[in-house]
Amino acid sequence: IEHGTITAVINGEPFEITTLRSDDKTDGRKAEVSFITNWKEDARRRDLTYNAMSIDFDGRLYDYFDGMNDLQNKVSKFVGDPEERIKEDYLRILRYFRFQSKIANPVWDEETIQAIKSNVLGLRKISAERIWQEVSKMLMGSNLDAILTYMNQTGVTGAIGLTTNNKEQLDRITYDHPVVGLAVLVSDSNISDRWKMSRGEKDLLHFLVTNKKTRLVQKTAEDMIIAGEDKAKLIALAQMQGLKQLADTLVQFQPPVFPVQGRDLLDKGMASGPSVGIALDKLKAIWKDSNYKLSKQQLLDKL
């Protein structure tokens, strides 16, 4: 509400509705705004020219800053003076690269690149959560080898603490989660704490980095899933290693359920206690050796 935005939920889908506004004061992170009625003035405060376009209910396009031409030329440009736009919110540097990753074979505007170089240290003012939010979206884009090359050259990766090892691999693999792309680039999972990633994201990154050099094969992956490993993690690992066919196979894989429970052993007269767990582990090993074929009764007969 403070910035003139509300979220309406229609049929379960959220839509942001924002009034026209102008930025009266900025500090490189957030702005003090006032509400206005001039569409062009509202568009002037946008970051990129094509993000400043709007369309009415009759399909008429309002393009005050030649955004459509920039899109057709596959180039991202800031509205007006790029240095001014960046200094209003330094996160716009990362947004620039994120939107470049959405364009096939993008063109690089030299004035924009120079403005980013001159203001890159401003990224240190940006919260870790906002940095990861933008980087995660960028990692789901394309042309990432080129994108990260320019981020290196402009000092962006250094400013946000991102290493770019094996960046050329990103354009050769397909993945469903941005953490997979991040795992390709980093050698440890420490960045997950710096960027304040969610617990699930941290767990996935740690798993992928830890197992990065372990070549995954179908039997091993299926055994791990049957033993209780999160199937989504194994799918992500296969995707990171460029094993698309294996990843697709694991998506369809339905693990068999170990047929014996502790109460089955108690019913056979075994005393409760540590011996039950030891016996279950022994039966699980036998079940695995049978390629998970033995039935409950066949396993119980092994006791």
Put a short name on every predicted segment.
Residues 1-303:
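Catalytic cores of the polymerase beta-like nucleotidyltransferase superfamily
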